[in-house]
């Protein structure tokens, strides 16, 4: 904590997000709490039975940053196609995901409507690409950065209006 106190004394308030994902020991949890920095909540993790219920949006604290997925996850649509059927079914029921709305739009709505102070959605999820748009696969040395390979034709005026309206409807 001394490092963070010294940095704040020199630089002022720090805008740091704690990557509190994976295996967390009691000492790590204490450090996160003592730091006062927001942690991460990943919506995709909510429906993976191995992750427990802390990732379900109704369990989020307000002082957190919500992500639909991270650079190490598949895109929403990729996840919908590869996750266990029970996980996908749970996600559809919990977030009221429909094909008509678009599964990516429904999961984004869930992130943006959560109580978290901030929600971040990767561009791959916004433009609605599948696994071909995945940014990174841990331990895979091939270059991925999938969004750069996506057609610009997805970014229409109607698309921009829909994104703006969705953001406005979930801004509290």
Which residue stretches match the model-derived regions?
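Catalytic cores of glycan-processing enzymes that make or break glycosidic bonds
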Residues: 1-172
């Amino acid at each position: 904590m001394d490092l963070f106190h010294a940095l704040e004394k020199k630089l002022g308030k720090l805008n740091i997000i704690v990557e509190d994902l994976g295996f967390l020991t009691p000492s790590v949890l204490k450090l996160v709490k003592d730091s006062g920095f927001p942690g991460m909540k990943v919506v995709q993790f909510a429906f993976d039975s191995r992750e427990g219920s802390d990732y379900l949006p109704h369990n989020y604290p307000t002082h957190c940053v919500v992500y639909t997925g991270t650079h190490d996850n598949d895109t929403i649509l990729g996840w919908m196609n590869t996750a266990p059927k029970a996980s996908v079914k749970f996600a559809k029921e919990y977030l009221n995901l429909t094909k008509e709305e678009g599964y990516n739009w429904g999961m984004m709505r869930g992130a943006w409507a959560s109580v978290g102070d901030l929600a971040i959605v990767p561009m791959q999820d916004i433009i609605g690409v599948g696994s071909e748009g995945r940014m990174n696969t841990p331990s895979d040395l091939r270059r991925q950065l999938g969004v750069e390979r996506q057609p610009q034709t997805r970014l229409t005026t109607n698309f921009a209006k829909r994104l703006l309206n969705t953001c406005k409807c979930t801004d509290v």
